[in-house]
Curated annotation (Swiss-Prot):
The active site is at 67 (proton acceptor). It comes from Borrelia turicatae (strain 91E135). InterPro entries: UDG_fam1, Ura-DNA_Glyclase_AS, Uracil-DNA_glycosylase-like, Uracil-DNA_glycosylase-like_sf. SMART domains: UDG, UreE_C. Its EC number is 3.2.2.27. It catalyses: Hydrolyzes single-stranded DNA or mismatched double-stranded DNA and polynucleotides, releasing free uracil. Excises uracil residues from the DNA which can arise as a result of misincorporation of dUMP residues by DNA polymerase or due to deamination of cytosine. This is Uracil-DNA glycosylase. One of its GO terms (molecular function) is uracil DNA N-glycosylase activity. PANTHER family: URACIL-DNA GLYCOSYLASE (PTHR11264:SF0).
């Protein structure tokens, strides 16, 4: 079936788009947008924003989230990211805090992480849509099958990618990644409930920049 997505991704994922689970998923999502109008996030054109913002071959880092923010106006299709006019959520505040601590830089007080995506950071939620006020409402409808395949395709076809797995949900994806050719970084989730259990002080960002340099890749400006 025809899916509107960046061309290099369309080529890599064309096999998935033809599978029966994906067709059922698309039909379900279309019906959700039709019947619940503006209560499904992000907007339809931003569902594949993480893919549209970064061609496949340009991926240097994968940061894995669970599902989109469920507040109105927050989700923009990039994991942990919000639109620029939205207050920065607590988890993202902690991400910025760890960047500042680890890299000794000052971050921009703007929650739109498009500036990271265009440099090579693939901000992937495992579940790509959500209903307003109902976290995980689109769990087990097919998105996890799709995004698990995305992770496996990245692992198989690219080399020396950094995978940042924060929290038990993300860490559960470790088995999908070939650790012999990629760097896997694991710690607690940046949520205020768990950030002090490892995330703050993890040095994931400094480790990532060191790894990119060692493998002759252009660095990322995490400001």
């Amino acid at each position: 079936m025809e899916v509107k997505i960046e061309e290099s991704w369309k080529e890599m994922l064309k096999g998935e788009f033809c599978k029966s689970y994906f067709k059922r998923l698309v039909n379900f999502i279309k019906n959700e947008y039709k019947t619940k109008k503006d209560k499904i996030f992000p907007s339809p054109k931003l569902i594949f924003n993480a893919f549209d913002s970064l061609p496949f071959k340009d991926i240097k880092i994968v940061i894995l989230g669970q599902d989109p923010y469920h507040g109105k106006g927050q989700a923009n299709g990039l994991a942990f990211s919000v639109n620029s006019d939205i207050k920065i959520p607590p988890s993202l505040q902690n991400i910025f805090k760890e960047i500042e601590r680890s890299l000794k830089i000052k971050t921009i007080p703007n929650g739109d992480l498009t500036r990271w995506a265009t440099q090579g950071v693939f901000l992937l939620n495992s579940i790509l849509t959500v209903e307003e006020g109902r976290p995980s409402s689109h769990k087990d409808i097919g998105w996890e099958i799709f995004t698990n395949e995305v992770i496996k395709i990245i692992s198989k076809n690219l080399n020396n990618v950094v995978f940042m797995l924060w929290g038990n949900f993300a860490r559960g994806k470790k088995e999908l990644i070939d650790a012999s050719k990629h760097l896997i970084l694991e710690t607690s989730h940046p949520s205020p409930y768990s950030a002090h259990n490892g995330f703050l002080g993890s040095n994931h960002f400094s480790q990532t920049l060191k790894y990119l340099k060692e493998h002759n890749k252009i660095s990322i400006d995490f400001q």
